[in-house]
């Protein structure tokens, strides 16, 4: 099995743009720099997972339909082992080199990678639109220290969504109020997103 390589930036670049803790709605200011030629590159995943001098760029996609948000439970196979059994509102995944032949990604190829990741993990019936609504950083735990989330909001014209992955279980749509009532059961990034959605 070949070694997986994933998209990263150097931590000092993040600090230079403006490090933050929690949710940052000024996404474009960061993406313009992160996705500029030469500012991102691919790194062996085992190294990236234990190296806080780099940030893995993780698209974190939220799905909304008719006032409700997709929620699921992380299963025990695949994905980030440190998040198993948590509830999540975000479908997240690393961006791999097969998304681009070059050494780094520009905006269009990044967005293509996001769509490919969603197609691999979910079966969505109907059309959708998407936009980036913010970024997530959480240096309070070992998972967050090596990741930077880019939050994509997908607006769906149907709630007919099924899982393609064993790691995505018990899919349902909840109102924001119901989600906040279950806030303690959400993984950290989902808590951060839910808190933002509650005041947005």
In which residue ranges do the predicted regions lie?
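N-terminal leader/linker segments that precede catalytic domains of diphosphate-processing enzymes
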Residues: 1-168, 174-200
């Amino acid at each position: 099995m070949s070694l997986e390589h994933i998209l990263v930036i150097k931590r000092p670049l993040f600090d230079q743009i403006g490090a933050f803790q929690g949710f940052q709605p000024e996404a474009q200011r960061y993406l313009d720099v992160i996705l500029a030629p030469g500012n991102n590159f691919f790194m062996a995943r085992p190294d990236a997972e234990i190296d806080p001098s780099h940030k893995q760029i993780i698209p974190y996609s939220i799905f909304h339909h008719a006032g409700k948000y997709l929620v699921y439970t992380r299963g025990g196979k695949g994905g980030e082992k440190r998040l198993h059994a948590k509830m999540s509102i975000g479908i997240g995944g690393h961006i791999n080199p097969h998304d681009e032949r070059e050494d780094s990604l520009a905006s269009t190829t990044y967005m293509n990678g996001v769509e490919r990741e969603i197609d691999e993990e979910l079966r969505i019936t109907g059309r959708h639109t998407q936009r980036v609504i913010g970024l997530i950083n959480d240096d309070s735990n070992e998972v967050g220290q090596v990741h930077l989330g880019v939050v994509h909001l997908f607006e769906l014209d149907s709630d007919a969504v099924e899982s393609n992955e064993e790691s995505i279980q018990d899919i349902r749509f909840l109102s924001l109020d119901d989600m906040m009532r279950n806030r303690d059961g959400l993984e950290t990034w989902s808590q951060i997103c839910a808190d933002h959605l509650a005041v947005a």
